[in-house]
Amino acid sequence: MDLLKECREELEYAVSVRRYLHENPEPAAHELQTVRFIVSELEKFGIEYLNIPDGGVLGFVRGALPGKTVMLRADCDALKMTEAPDNGKAPKVCVSKVPGLAHACGHDTHTAMLLTAGKVLAKNRDSLKGTVILMFERGEEGGGNIYYLLKYMREHQITADACFAQHNDPLLPVGQIAVSPGPRFAGSFGFHIRLTGVGGHGSRPDRGNNPIDCFLAIAAQFKDLRMRMIPPDVLFTASINMVNAGSAHNITPETLTFAGTVRTYDFQKGIRFREKFREIIEKNCEIFECGCEFLRWKGPTIPVINQNEATRFARAMSESVLGAENVSDNIPDLCGESFGVTTAFFPCVLAAVGSGNAAEGRTAPLHSPYYDPDEDSLLYGSAYYAACAYGFTDADLTFNFEPFQEELEALYKLTNRPIPKRLDP
């Protein structure tokens, strides 16, 4: 079957879906209108589904022939930011109609691609083997809603033999896919700390206790810790990106707050770094006689590491759709991705689908107000999804993978993250 041709015939549909979602964005954990739209589209295609409260939607395309189960994943939430009406070179074809919200990470394109792939798969279910699960994940941008999706799946014995995902990449030209084994997105650890000293007049530091002194010691040792603990060939970044203290040149401040992030592909090194950094903070507070409050202390999250065998398969499927000359290795990205939680339970791959077009000014990065993906990427992303589904269910493949054996709550405890609150009415 020529899946690229099949998806090309549905490109107009994919574009219409993307534009509707783009104009009507909803933030993480609040995607009720988006979910209603997804469900209505699945109903049109005759695809059975489960709308899981606070989690997302699972669609089930059941083939006419027996076979394995494969899962395709997309996210659907937007960012709390204001979108520019142009991409820096030309006006955009559509812009958010909701003040302060924008699909600046392309989750609208991901949902459009997966719905289009689902439509193609459902139309050809007579030749499809096994079952294809369409996972529409809510709350990727910090909402944590994947917890409720996976919890439901585990409680109801819904499983898959592999899971394939993708993320649009405006730095990769449209018509190209990048996918390779190993590191894809990093695990992240975020911190926000308040130090409390004693305020006073700047002329008499002996009568106060300046928390800036304590912070300077912590910051220096924070940098040293990265040098001492992490080999130079390991992708690992640690940065303090916010410091707030003081109100005048001659007033010793009473408090100081600082915040930052750590990114790593090595989960265990991330945990070890977190533990040692906490020791540094607490011991310096003791030395400088400052109070300390951990306002945020979360992570590290699970990094996205593409499973070797599944990635080789996904690359072969990408080449079958676009040709080997248009498929390359992905560059590891130290951004975080909630898909890491899913990778703990299934052999997974997350590919990059090019959405950039320099000639049209469509090269602004993700999370930029000027972000403006080339809509032709919808064709290649949906074809990638469909090819992975058809190819996997038709092949005799078993991936060497050991899932996380404990309960989902144990994984969240390990990552030092709370169970997300339920918000659905």
What are these regions (language model features)?
Residues 26, 75-77, 139, 169, ...:
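Active-site beta-loop-alpha junctions enriched in small/polar residues
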Residues 71-73, 82, 191, 350-355:
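Non-cysteine beta-strand/loop elements that form the S-adenosyl-L-methionine
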Residues 79-81, 92-102, 108-109, 121-242, ...:
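Histidine/acidic-residue-rich, glycine-tolerant segments that coordinate divalent metal ions
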Residues 1-103, 108, 112-129:
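Acidic/His- and Gly-rich active-site-bordering loop/insert found
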Residues 38, 113-121, 149, 215-218, ...:
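Buried hydrophobic packing segments
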Residues 21, 59, 72, 107, ...:
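Divalent metal-coordination and catalytic microenvironments
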